[in-house]
Amino acid sequence: MAGILGAGVQDGLLLKPIKYQWAMDLYDQAVANTWFPNEIQLAQDLADWDKMSDEERHAVTFLMSYFNPNELLVNKALAFGVYPYVNAAETHLYLAKQMWEEANHCMAFEYVLDTFPIDRTMSADTLPMT
Protein backbone atom coordinates (compact mmCIF):
# COMPACT_ATOMS: atom_id res chain seq x y z
CA MET A 1 0.00 0.00 0.00
CA ALA A 2 1.38 3.39 -0.99
CA GLY A 3 1.79 6.09 1.63
CA ILE A 4 0.03 9.42 1.61
CA LEU A 5 2.89 11.16 -0.22
CA GLY A 6 4.05 10.41 -3.74
CA ALA A 7 3.31 11.34 -7.32
CA GLY A 8 -0.44 11.41 -6.77
CA VAL A 9 -1.23 9.92 -10.18
CA GLN A 10 -1.06 6.13 -10.10
CA ASP A 11 -2.44 5.79 -6.61
CA GLY A 12 -5.44 7.65 -5.30
CA LEU A 13 -7.82 6.99 -8.17
CA LEU A 14 -10.35 5.08 -6.05
CA LEU A 15 -12.12 6.57 -3.06
CA LYS A 16 -12.91 3.24 -1.42
CA PRO A 17 -11.50 1.79 0.70
CA ILE A 18 -10.77 4.97 2.60
CA LYS A 19 -7.24 4.91 4.01
CA TYR A 20 -7.25 8.21 5.89
CA GLN A 21 -10.53 8.69 7.74
CA TRP A 22 -9.32 12.03 9.14
CA ALA A 23 -9.21 13.41 5.58
CA MET A 24 -12.80 12.29 4.90
CA ASP A 25 -13.87 13.79 8.22
CA LEU A 26 -12.26 17.11 7.27
CA TYR A 27 -13.91 16.97 3.84
CA ASP A 28 -17.34 16.24 5.35
CA GLN A 29 -16.90 19.08 7.86
CA ALA A 30 -15.85 21.48 5.09
CA VAL A 31 -18.87 20.55 2.97
CA ALA A 32 -21.18 21.03 5.96
CA ASN A 33 -19.71 24.51 6.49
CA THR A 34 -20.18 25.67 2.91
CA TRP A 35 -21.28 29.30 2.58
CA PHE A 36 -21.62 31.86 -0.19
CA PRO A 37 -20.51 35.50 0.09
CA ASN A 38 -23.50 36.98 -1.74
CA GLU A 39 -25.83 35.44 0.86
CA ILE A 40 -24.29 37.58 3.61
CA GLN A 41 -26.39 40.60 4.50
CA LEU A 42 -24.18 43.68 4.73
CA ALA A 43 -26.76 46.31 5.76
CA GLN A 44 -25.49 46.60 9.34
CA ASP A 45 -21.89 46.58 8.12
CA LEU A 46 -22.65 49.44 5.73
CA ALA A 47 -24.27 51.38 8.58
CA ASP A 48 -21.17 50.77 10.71
CA TRP A 49 -18.99 51.88 7.77
CA ASP A 50 -20.74 55.24 7.76
CA LYS A 51 -19.87 55.71 11.45
CA MET A 52 -16.15 55.02 10.94
CA SER A 53 -13.50 57.68 10.75
CA ASP A 54 -11.56 58.15 7.51
CA GLU A 55 -8.59 56.39 9.10
CA GLU A 56 -10.72 53.40 10.11
CA ARG A 57 -12.22 53.14 6.62
CA HIS A 58 -8.74 53.34 5.08
CA ALA A 59 -7.53 50.53 7.37
CA VAL A 60 -10.48 48.31 6.47
CA THR A 61 -10.03 49.02 2.75
CA PHE A 62 -6.32 48.30 2.90
CA LEU A 63 -6.70 45.08 4.88
CA MET A 64 -9.57 43.73 2.77
CA SER A 65 -7.70 44.40 -0.45
CA TYR A 66 -4.47 43.01 1.03
CA PHE A 67 -6.01 39.71 2.12
CA ASN A 68 -7.86 39.25 -1.16
CA PRO A 69 -4.85 38.36 -3.38
CA ASN A 70 -3.29 36.41 -0.53
CA GLU A 71 -6.25 34.02 -0.58
CA LEU A 72 -5.33 33.27 -4.18
CA LEU A 73 -1.72 32.69 -3.14
CA VAL A 74 -2.88 30.12 -0.58
CA ASN A 75 -4.97 28.50 -3.30
CA LYS A 76 -1.97 28.29 -5.63
CA ALA A 77 0.21 26.89 -2.85
CA LEU A 78 -2.30 24.11 -2.25
CA ALA A 79 -2.80 23.46 -5.97
CA PHE A 80 0.86 23.36 -6.96
CA GLY A 81 2.71 22.71 -3.72
CA VAL A 82 0.58 20.07 -2.00
CA TYR A 83 -2.12 18.53 -4.21
CA PRO A 84 0.23 16.93 -6.78
CA TYR A 85 2.18 15.14 -4.05
CA VAL A 86 -0.56 13.32 -2.16
CA ASN A 87 -1.83 9.94 -3.22
CA ALA A 88 -5.02 9.25 -1.32
CA ALA A 89 -8.28 10.15 -3.04
CA GLU A 90 -9.81 11.38 0.21
CA THR A 91 -6.96 13.86 0.66
CA HIS A 92 -7.54 15.04 -2.92
CA LEU A 93 -11.21 15.61 -2.08
CA TYR A 94 -10.36 17.63 1.01
CA LEU A 95 -7.66 19.68 -0.74
CA ALA A 96 -10.02 20.43 -3.64
CA LYS A 97 -12.65 21.64 -1.17
CA GLN A 98 -10.06 23.73 0.65
CA MET A 99 -8.97 25.30 -2.65
CA TRP A 100 -12.62 26.12 -3.34
CA GLU A 101 -12.81 27.74 0.12
CA GLU A 102 -9.80 29.92 -0.63
CA ALA A 103 -11.43 31.04 -3.89
CA ASN A 104 -14.64 31.67 -1.95
CA HIS A 105 -12.74 33.83 0.54
CA CYS A 106 -11.37 35.84 -2.37
CA MET A 107 -14.89 36.33 -3.70
CA ALA A 108 -16.05 37.37 -0.22
CA PHE A 109 -13.42 40.11 -0.09
CA GLU A 110 -14.43 41.19 -3.61
CA TYR A 111 -18.08 41.25 -2.54
CA VAL A 112 -17.28 43.59 0.35
CA LEU A 113 -14.97 45.77 -1.76
CA ASP A 114 -17.66 46.04 -4.46
CA THR A 115 -20.55 46.61 -2.02
CA PHE A 116 -18.97 49.26 0.16
CA PRO A 117 -18.30 52.78 -1.16
CA ILE A 118 -14.59 52.05 -1.47
CA ASP A 119 -12.13 53.90 -3.66
CA ARG A 120 -10.20 50.98 -5.15
CA THR A 121 -7.35 53.31 -6.15
CA MET A 122 -6.55 53.56 -2.44
CA SER A 123 -6.55 49.83 -1.80
CA ALA A 124 -3.53 47.60 -1.29
CA ASP A 125 -3.91 45.82 -4.61
CA THR A 126 -3.36 49.07 -6.53
CA LEU A 127 -0.30 50.23 -4.63
CA PRO A 128 3.06 49.88 -6.40
CA MET A 129 5.20 47.02 -5.12
CA THR A 130 8.61 48.10 -3.80
Question: Over which residues does each language-model region extend?
Answer:
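Non-heme di-metal
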Residues: 1-130
